[in-house]
Design a protein with these regions (language model features):
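Residues in well-ordered beta-strands of folded domains
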Residues: 6, 62-64, 211-215
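Intrinsically disordered, low-complexity boundary segments flanking structured domains
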Residues: 24, 46-51, 197-200
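Short, surface-exposed beta-strand/loop "edge" segments at domain boundaries and coil↔beta transitions
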Residues: 13-15, 32, 68-74, 220-221
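Exposed, interaction-prone assembly regions rather than primary DNA-binding/catalytic cores
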Residues: 35-100
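A short linear-motif detector with a strong N-terminal bias
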Residues: 15-17, 23, 39-42, 103-104, ...
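Short, ordered beta-strand-loop transition motifs
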Residues: 1, 56, 204-206
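Hydrophobic alpha-helical interaction segments
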Residues: 93-229
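Short beta-edge/loop segments at beta->alpha junctions of small alpha/beta modules
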Residues: 1-35, 148-175
């Protein structure tokens, strides 16, 4: 059985003594060959698409696939959240190796390791799957605003392989809202959006085109509110 050893830390377990979660992930992926990846909001953050920090709590780190259970018990500077890869029919579609930014961490810089992480096209779908319990419409909307360079062919492939109708409908709710140039090149004919209305959030309003309940301010033509991060 694979495992890790860590030198006992100081009595108080200060933040400085905690393991950089990226080092733990790269060790599990590269040295121990565990088949999992970093995804969702975490992958979007690694790729520069998240510009806010969680206040008052450790940052959630989203892992997808067969991540080792001991990873969740390590005293890292993140809070691991384990997810399956069932959101897609093809489990490894839209996953690429990403060089870690050194930002002062000599180990990351010298070892030249990479992290297996979702591409932005996959990561935004994983992030949408966290609504409404583990993320907010405001945060997703802010992230979507910056997704100006998604690859339409990859978007099409991932949406066609996505197994959750509500995630696909939500994607188009935000995509239509922001009208990035790549959207007109997405082949909607191969994407199954299901049929019928979907009740997604309590007290929401039904989107007139995508037939899913969402906060009223995200309905086209409605005044915008701010539900906070």
């Amino acid at each position: 059985m694979h495992g890790v050893y860590r030198r006992p830390s100081g009595r108080n377990g200060s933040a400085e003594e905690r393991i950089d979660w990226r080092i733990a992930v790269m060790s599990a992926q590269t040295i121990m060959d565990y088949p999992f990846h970093v995804g969702g909001r975490t992958a979007l953050g690694l790729r520069g698409h998240v510009h806010y920090l969680a206040l008052g709590a450790a940052e959630k780190i989203f892992f997808y696939g067969d991540a080792p259970r001991w990873l969740a018990n390590l005293p890292t500077n993140g809070l691991p959240v384990l997810r399956s890869t069932r959101l897609f029919k093809t489990a490894d579609l839209g996953i690429e190796s990403l060089a870690a930014e050194p930002d002062g961490n000599a180990i990351l810089f010298l070892q030249n390791w990479t992290i297996r992480a979702s591409t932005p096209e996959r990561a935004i779908l994983e992030a949408l799957d966290e609504l409404p319990d583990n993320d907010s419409f405001h945060n997703i909307d802010t992230i979507f605003e910056g997704l100006t360079n998604l690859r339409p062919r990859r978007v099409t492939e991932l949406l066609a392989a996505c197994t959750k109708v509500q995630v696909k409908r939500l994607f188009f709710v935000f995509a239509d809202r922001h009208e990035h140039a790549w959207l007109k090149h997405v082949d909607r004919s191969v994407i199954d959006l299901g049929s019928g209305d979907r009740s997604f959030i309590k007290g929401g309003k039904l989107h007139p085109k995508y037939r899913i309940t969402i906060p009223e301010e995200y309905i086209p033509g409605k005044p915008e509110g701010n539900d906070g991060p």
